[in-house]
Amino acid sequence: MSNALRWLLWLIVAVVVIAGGYALYTLLRPVGPEPAAPIAGAPAGISDKLARGEYLARAADCVACHTAPGGKPFAGGFAFKLPFGTIYGTNITADPQTGIGGWSDDQFVRAVREGVGPQGNLYPAMPYTSYTALSRDDVLAIKAYLFSLPPIKQANPENGLSFPFNQRWGMKFWNLAFFNEKRFEPNLNQDEQWNRGAYLATALGHCSECHTPRNLGFGINQSKNLSGEVIQGWFAANITPDKQTGIGAWSEQQLSEYLATGHAPGRSSASGPMAEAVENSLQYLTPEDNQALVKYLRNIEPIATDSASEVNLQPKGATSSSAILPGGQEDSLGRRLFAGDCSGCHQWNGTGRQSKYASLVGSTAVNDPQGRSVVQAILKGTRISIGEQHELMPDFGAQYSDEEVAAVANYVVGQFGEKQGKVTAKQVAEQRKQ
């Protein structure tokens, strides 16, 4: 027997064994019991199924991934730019041709909780790895709400993935390696409020999808849960209760206000994807659910990360400046650019003019020596709408060169974080693509 034939036979045997193992796993895998009330579901005061579905769809932030910028809600087209290509959020309106109008209850539940739709496996850009913990009743309430909305006929864009990532069947093996299909189970050592917060954070809110580092296989690294990750060029901060590098030094009021409005006095203002999460989802939580989420985040395992990013609440550059007169750093390109385009809103002492959202002192973004979110804000701008209040920072991506973006980002990190900025023109060029 030739070596080539021998290798071919071994390959066939390996494929058969792996396929058989996966088939056996799908039959025998433990999925856990259905979550029981009152942990699961919308607040008890919302009894109408459509109202429950609307609340849950907002808590799950469905609109963010299934709506293109400037597009119709839930009609799809949002682009996820990943290292291996681009994936587009799909149309989840009730249109029977281009949406999910022809899906049965079981098909919808399976897609949301197992990542398998009528046309095959979904990619984990759809956070079924978190939604798997949802109760069936909650998933079907979301479906009922989506089906109550006007159907929108809009074809889904073709994904732009390179081989082998464009082979959906390969997701079966990814799931085998990285997907733990299990319903939410309350922690009996914690009270009802904490467990409610856990359900909101881990299942509905899928916080770990953005705030937890990924491994080489793009699976979530649970050993570093919520300790921070880069998402679409923005740095999703450490939200564990570590006092130096997480949110452990925040007061409960600061955290509650940040979740409800996107701004915490003396701390951060939400930008980028986090601003979208607050705008589309978190601001609509009931006060009780807001407090449950706060309690959960304040009472999980703290994880210390890079101490170089520890927030400085009294940076010398800001404290030595007034609102209109700069102190601190010497003249530089970054300082001149800040003077011309930034100081009018942010002010030299970083307190912000007219809007609290323009404050910079205490921000996790300006305390990151790599300046990732600062660069994104300069390149892309950022916006947030809370109720009738609309806040906007314009983008400067077309106006500034890569060198200029790096210069002003490093100035901001130095002036308002008292850190040595490490942003380079090469980094900026890479972030422009994201």
What kind of feature is each model-predicted range?
Residues 2-36:
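N-terminal type II signal-anchor transmembrane helix
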Residues 29-40, 67-86, 118-198, 202-203, ...:
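Flexible coil segments in periplasmic/lumen-exposed cytochrome c-class electron-transfer proteins
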Residues 42-74, 79:
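Short extracytoplasmic
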Residues 62-65, 207-210, 342-345:
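Short cysteine clusters
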Residues 86-94, 234-240:
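Acidic/histidine-rich, surface-exposed loop or edge segments in extracytoplasmic proteins
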Residues 100-115, 119, 248-251, 255:
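Aromatic- and charge-enriched surface segment that lines or borders ligand/interaction sites
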Residues 259, 361-404:
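Extended, polar beta-sheet/loop recognition surfaces of beta-rich domains
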Residues 330-371, 376:
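C-terminal structural cap/anchor segments
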